[in-house]
Swiss-Prot record:
Biased composition (Gly residues): 487-505
Protein's organism: Drosophila melanogaster (Fruit fly)
ZnF segments: C2H2-type: 1197-1219, 1225-1247, 1253-1276, 1292-1315
Function: Transcriptional regulator with essential functions in the germline and soma. Plays an essential role in regulating the formation of apical cell extensions such as denticles and aristae, and initiating cytoskeletal remodeling during epidermal differentiation.
Compositional bias per record (Acidic residues), positions renumbered to this chain: 233-242
Record-given protein name: Transcriptional regulator ovo
UniProt signal peptide: none
């Protein structure tokens, strides 16, 4: 094969070089052949074809003609290529070789390749020779003619085939072809020979001059016989051409190739074909050669051969196999206009050769002809090349693998969603692949694509595989899962010899990334979300055979992703598994693709290891000088920092990480110092970062957790991988008091993700969830500001962007508390995989080492609770397996990175965790707050120094509270609502967050439930926490002492109790994480996508202006909105802070909101600033000015994706849904996603059979009023009474039974009496659902009970 490819390349070059000479020769040949009058059909066919033959043979000589074996010269050149084709072709032609000499010629050029065909053909050829020496001569002559013309070549083979089949026909056809060519131009033969000689000279690689001479001499000797049989041959030449003209397609002179391919189907009529092919011989030969030989190499005239050269080797094989032209007799020949003279000649020719050749070759060729018999397969051949064209390198196999992967991924996702809870419970010491599976499944669910949890975990407990990527996870080593994301879902195959495989998407995103979509597991929104970087992320070359090699698809766009992946891989490696991440391309910084070389047990300095992650066992893990990412590889430095690529944490970081179980002194980024994040130097892959975070989040964070848990519990590389954001924040505050200012971090987060990709990425709920999951990892060390920031910042600040420096927070006591809390947590976390993930993310985001230590401690205790300390981080990772929770949590929290709504939701969800971690979190939270303030301040200060200064100075505390709160909440809630919420609650901004849901007690309850439902991901988690761990809320209260936390407790508990009861089966069926709180729509037949949660609209709501934010707060967002608004301090602080850094920070928030679908968070004070930012970021495309314009209500609202303009923000918001692949609403029956309740209702009625609109004139009923009106107008000519665009009368339809009424009171009473558990009843206070005309009735309803918390 390689030789063939080389030959193809040579042939390409030679053919191109020969094109000019061949063109001249062909023109001459064409002229000469045209001059030959007797064989007008053959002449016309051969005339043009000889020129193509001259050209095409050089081009396809190795390919097409060698395949044909017709022209020795052509055979000589690309023999190797054509050999395979020819083998197939011959096997299909079944010994349909022209003559032994011709075969020998073919053999000499392709002795090996043609050996089999020749051997197969030898008996037939011997018989042919015995039967008639003329046949051999004719074969030689045919070969010469074939050299001269594709028709002759094809006819020669066809003649052989025909001779085998029918001696008379075959002989006549061969002779006819030769005779026709000779008669047409005996001179042309020499010219053709000359042309061939020239071609041979040019193509000296092919040593057939001697054979040509032989053929020439033989052909000349045979010319007399050919001339005698020219007339016979003419008819059968056409026939033969049709039957054997597969080589001709090579000649695209006539451009009839396709039609000829079609004719291939017909050629069974030999005589008709002979005439038709003679006339359209160039075309028909082109057809066959197209499918067989010329499909790869076009006719000499065209350079298509050059286009197809790589394919021909693979293609021709299958083409010939499938489309071996049946004998001319068997082929149905398209009846082209026959030349009467050629027909007569054909009849003459037929007489002599038919009698001679039929017996000898009929036996041999008939079976091959039978095989070729279904000539209708040739159209299949025509398509087969296309199939094969993708399979240059066994692409067919790859495609099959991809399909299989996609199928497996879907199944895995399905299973993973179901197994999400189990995974938490059954956390193995290895990263829980189920987490990865469930996350993609959740993400897929968020996309509304149904629960295809497609994560195949090569190493079930160990390989961390995000099903979303449809990646094949082949466990390499006990814990390593090498993941090749099918179709370029980045496959950071996680090879963790000792540390457990990191799974993965490129950037360790858990194989659920923008790259993943090709696998079919990912929802399409991923691709739309990815800023074009992820599809290429799959560029990542195959995984290294070594089980420890983790390949990340590294694209320049994937810097952060790859860096994050490398970082998490490195962290995984230091965690105890050698993980070698090979980032393809220069994705990761200086080294090209981030290659994470993590030696298991400390072995494994990266040869390529841009990131060298020493196994935990080997504290002295040498990082290559190139291992700029190594800093990330060390647990100290977030691999996301590898986005900086130059963070030297690699050397010291790795060594420190490995050496220092928990406290690795963090090396500053070579350029940005210890805390690049402090400078706002967040390597922002902006969209990539987020995708990377999503991918990294799952796979990386999980693997880091695993390795941290497995190898070095103290050195938790997950934090390094976890967030470059936290790393940056933490690194700026390397000290336990991370210098990162949470507010600044928020701004940084926002700013880093200012790009338009934010919306795309935000719509990528999975990324958010991964992001959140990743932040969740920091829960353990929520003291580190980057932990808290992680969630908020993850979208914009990828783990790469933020450099989580291992902050040596004084968390030992906290760790003890954490251990105790973890024991409690684990019971709940097992149920909600998110809490552990949050802890993991806290570890990652928090002071990396201390966070790692704490995290390891937490995980240890978690494992003690669930398994053992050895499983600590893995356990945490395995708890993340319900990554959907983290995805939703991360989405919700990221959506509200700056808003307490999600944070509270996550907090509620992680309240138990918060209880467990509350003391530690409180202790570390202040440290983190300081660190985050410093780090975030530094980051934003660097990125937006003035903004940061203003923010820091004016609202430094407020900002800390607000952003830190938001970040902490987001990260806490996302990473581990427990620790983050505890910390946040401990913080003043936590109080703000906690107060967010307390606009009103009832509203807070409703908001808590609504936020839980609206932010199904975060909220579902929160209600889970509230219900299963109401103490978590209490801990949040105790730690945060925030007013909201009690509200969250009561409300979330009530909402969770109410909603979770019904939603658990649904969540399971939809493959959502068990902790999710679902918000029902459409009478309970649809749910708000927990991952999209109002944030998944391509950012419409999260992008909403402040004006729109009010609407959002009114809507399902209102709960989160209220929560955020419930903390006016936060709003004021954020507003003031963001006003100070309005444009930039708003742009950050815009991006975050867009990315995180922060309409929930945007609905709060931050939504005032950031909502403007996000809305305008999307609308105006300019962060600051657009924000002002959008907020000012400019008439120009521009869609950043398609540049459409809208006069109203709501119109833009509605339009943005079109660009979001994460659907806002999911069908509870099938999980299909929709962005509009109108479409959801129309769809769900197909499940329920509700057809409320009945035609009074006939029996028909319809699901939509418009359908009924259209029906009445068209069928019954009944015109409706509504004017154009006039709003119809409100119709209340019971989605359960189809009961319809125009009275809201009747509808409500119907629901209450007949469907008392219908979620629609919970909307009675919503004027959109119940426009009560009777105010007294409405007041009575509202006065009966507190506002329903459900939605």
């Amino acid at each position: 094969m390689p030789k063939i490819f080389l030959i193809k390349n040579r042939l390409h070059q030679q053919q191109q070089r020969l094109l000019e000479s061949q063109n001249l020769l062909q023109h001459k040949n064409q002229d000469d052949e045209r001059l030959v009058p007797p064989l007008s059909p053959s002449g016309s066919g051969s005339g043009p074809s000889p020129t193509p033959t001259s050209q095409p043979p050089p081009e396809p000589q190795g390919q097409g003609q060698q395949v044909l074996g017709q022209v020795p010269d052509s055979d000589q050149q690309p023999l190797s290529l054509t050999r395979k084709r020819f083998h197939h072709r011959r096997h299909y032609f079944g010994q349909s070789r022209h003559s032994l000499d011709h075969l020998n010629q073919n053999q000499s050029p392709n002795p090996n390749a043609n050996a089999n065909p020749n051997q197969i053909q030898n008996p037939a050829e011997l018989e042919v020779e015995c039967a008639t020496g003329q046949v051999q001569n004719e074969n030689f002559a045919a070969e010469l003619l074939q050299r001269l013309t594709p028709n002759t070549a094809t006819t020669a083979q066809n003649n052989i085939v025909n001779n085998l089949v029918n001696n008379s026909r075959a002989a006549t056809s061969v002779l006819a072809t030769k005779d026709c060519t000779i008669e047409n131009s005996p001179i042309s033969i020499p010219k053709n020979q000359r042309a061939e000689d020239e071609e041979e000279q040019e193509d000296q690689e092919k040593e057939k001059p001697a054979e040509r001479e032989r053929e020439k001499s033989d052909e000349r000797t045979e010319q007399v016989e050919k001339e005698e049989r020219v007339e016979r041959e003419e008819e059968e030449d056409d026939e033969v051409d049709v039957g054997v003209e597969a080589p001709r397609p090579r000649f695209y002179n006539t451009g009839v190739v396709l039609t000829q391919a079609q004719r291939k189907e017909y050629p069974q009529e030999p005589k008709d074909l002979s005439l038709t092919i003679a006339k359209s011989s160039p075309a028909s030969p082109h057809i066959h050669s197209d499918s067989e030989s010329d499909s790869d190499s076009d006719g000499g005239c065209k350079l298509i051969v050059d286009e197809k050269p790589p394919l021909p080797v693979i293609k021709p094989l299958s083409l010939r196999l499938r489309s071996t032209p049946p004998p001319a007799d068997q082929r149905p020949s398209p009846p082209p206009p026959r030349d009467p003279a050629p027909a007569v000649r054909c009849s003459v020719i037929q007489r002599a050769p038919q009698s001679q050749l039929p017996t000898s070759r009929a036996g041999f060729l008939l079976p091959p002809l039978d095989q070729l018999g279904p000539e209708q397969q040739e159209p299949i051949d025509y398509h087969v090349p296309k199939r094969r064209s993708p399979s240059y390198d066994s692409d067919e196999e790859l495609n099959a693998r991809r399909l299989e992967r996609a199928r497996q991924v879907r199944e895995a996702r399905r299973r993973s969603t179901i197994l999400a809870a189990r995974v938490l419970l059954a956390q193995s010491q290895r990263l829980n692949p189920r987490l990865v599976r469930s996350l993609p499944g959740i993400l897929a669910a968020a996309a509304g694509h149904g629960r295809n949890s497609s994560s195949s975990s090569g190493a079930a407990g160990q390989g961390f595989q995000s099903s979303g990527f449809g990646s094949q996870n082949s466990g390499s080593g006990s814990s390593s899962g090498n993941q090749n994301a099918g179709s370029g879902a980045g496959s950071p195959g996680s090879g963790a010899g000792g540390g457990g495989g990191m799974g993965g998407g490129r950037d360790g995103r858990g194989n659920y990334g923008p790259n993943s979509p090709p696998t079919g597991a990912l929802p399409p929104f991923y691709e739309s979300l990815k800023s074009g970087q992820q599809s290429t992320a799959s560029n990542n070359t195959g995984q290294s055979p070594g089980a420890n090699h983790s390949h990340f698809n590294a694209n320049p766009a994937n810097f952060l992703q790859n860096a994050a992946a490398a970082a998490y891989i490195m962290s995984a490696g230091s965690g105890g598994g050698g993980c070698t991440g090979n980032g393809g391309g220069g994705a990761s910084g200086p080294g090209g693709g981030p290659s994470a070389n993590s030696g298991g047990g400390g072995g494994g300095g990266g040869g390529n290891g841009y990131i060298n992650c020493g196994g935990v066992g080997g504290p002295n893990n040498s990082l290559d000088g190139n291992n700029l990412l190594n800093f990330a590889s060390v647990s100290n430095y977030n691999e996301s920092n590898s986005k900086f690529h130059n963070h030297h944490h690699h050397h010291q970081h790795n060594n420190n990480n490995n050496n220092n179980g928990g406290q690795t002194s963090m090396m500053g980024h070579p350029f940005y110092g210890g805390n690049p994040s402090a400078y706002g130097i967040i390597l922002k892959d902006e969209p990539d970062i987020e995708y990377d975070e999503a991918k990294i989040d799952i796979g990386t964070f999980a693997q880091n957790i695993i390795q941290a848990t497995m190898g070095s519990s103290g050195q938790f590389n997950a934090s390094a991988y976890e967030d470059a954001i936290m790393s940056d924040l933490a690194s700026s505050g390397q000290c336990p008091n991370g210098a990162v200012d949470p507010l600044q971090f928020t701004a940084t987060l926002m700013l880093s993700s200012q790009t338009d990709h934010l919306l795309e990425q935000l719509s990528d709920a999975v990324d958010l969830s991964s992001f959140l999951q990743r932040s969740c990892v920091d829960d353990e060390e929520s003291t580190s500001p980057r932990q808290d920031f992680e969630l908020v910042s993850t979208p914009s600040l990828t783990p790469d962007s933020v450099t989580p420096v291992e902050q040596h927070n004084t968390n030992t006591t906290q760790l003890d508390v954490l251990h105790e809390n973890l024991l409690t947590q684990l019971t709940h976390n097992i149920v909600r995989g998110g809490s552990n993930q949050q802890q993991q993310h806290h570890q990652q985001h928090g002071v990396q080492q201390q966070q790692q230590q704490q995290h390891s401690v937490q995980q240890q205790q978690q494992h003690n609770v669930q398994q053992q300390h050895g499983v600590q981080q893995q356990h945490v990772q395995q708890q993340p397996p319900p990554s959907y929770q983290h995805a939703t949590r991360g989405l919700m929290m990221q959506q509200q990175p700056q808003h307490g709504g999600y944070q509270q939701q996550a907090a509620i969800m992680s309240q138990q965790q918060q209880q467990l971690l509350s003391q530690q979190q409180q202790q570390s939270h202040h440290q983190q707050q300081q660190q985050q303030q410093h780090a975030a301040a530094y980051q934003q200060h660097n990125i937006y120094a003035q903004q940061q200064q203003q923010q820091q100075q004016q609202h430094h505390q407020q900002q800390q509270q607000q952003q830190h709160h938001h970040f902490h909440h987001q990260q806490q809630q996302q990473p581990q609502p427990q620790s983050h919420h505890s910390h946040h609650h401990g913080h003043g901004h936590d109080n703000s967050n906690m107060s967010l849901p307390s606009p009103t007690a009832a509203a807070a309850a409703a908001a808590a439930a609504a936020a839980a439902a609206a932010a199904a991901a975060a909220h579902l988690q929160r209600p889970m926490s509230s219900s299963s761990s109401s103490g978590g809320t209490n801990s949040s209260n105790s730690s945060g002492g925030s007013s909201n936390s009690p509200l969250l407790d009561a409300n979330a508990a009530a909402a969770a109790a109410a909603a979770l009861l019904d939603t658990k089966p649904l969540i399971q069926s939809l493959g959502l994480p068990p902790d999710l709180q679902l918000e029902f729509v459409n009478g309970g037949h649809g749910i708000k996508n927990p991952l999209a949660v109002e944030n998944a609209h391509g950012g419409h709501h999260r992008i909403r202006n402040i004006d729109c934010i009010d609407d959002l707060s009114k809507h399902g967002h209102h709960s989160q909105h209220q929560q955020q608004q419930g903390s006016p301090q936060q709003q004021n602080m954020q507003q003031s802070v963001q006003q100070q850094s309005v444009q930039q920070q708003q742009s950050l928030q815009q991006q975050q909101q867009q990315q995180h679908h922060q309409h929930h968070s945007n609905s709060s004070a931050s939504s005032n600033a950031s909502s403007h930012g996000s809305a305008e970021a999307l609308c105006m495309g300019s962060s600051g000015g657009a924000n002002e314009d959008s907020s000012s209500g400019n008439n120009k609202f521009v869609c950043r994706v398609c540049m459409k303009t809208f006069s109203l923000q709501r119109l833009l918001n509605r339009h943005m849904k079109c660009h979001s692949d994460i659907k806002r609403y999911l069908c509870t029956f099938c999980g299909k996603g929709f962005n509009d309740t109108f479409d959801l209702k129309r769809h769900t009625r197909t499940h329920t059979g509700v057809r409320p609109y009945k035609c009074n004139l006939c029996e028909k009923s319809f699901t939509q009023r418009c359908s009924l009106e259209s029906h009445c107008q068209k069928v019954h000519s009944v015109q409706h009474q509504y004017a154009y665009k006039e709003r119809r009368a409100k119709m209340y339809v019971c989605e359960e039974c189809g009961h319809t009424t125009c009275e809201p009171e009747v509808h409500y009473l119907h629901l209450k009496n007949n469907h008392p558990f219908s979620p629609a009843l919970l909307k009675f206070y919503d004027k959109r659902h119940f426009k009560f005309t009777n105010s007294q009735f409405a007041n009575n309803l509202l006065g009966q009970l507190p506002m329903p918390v459900h939605n």
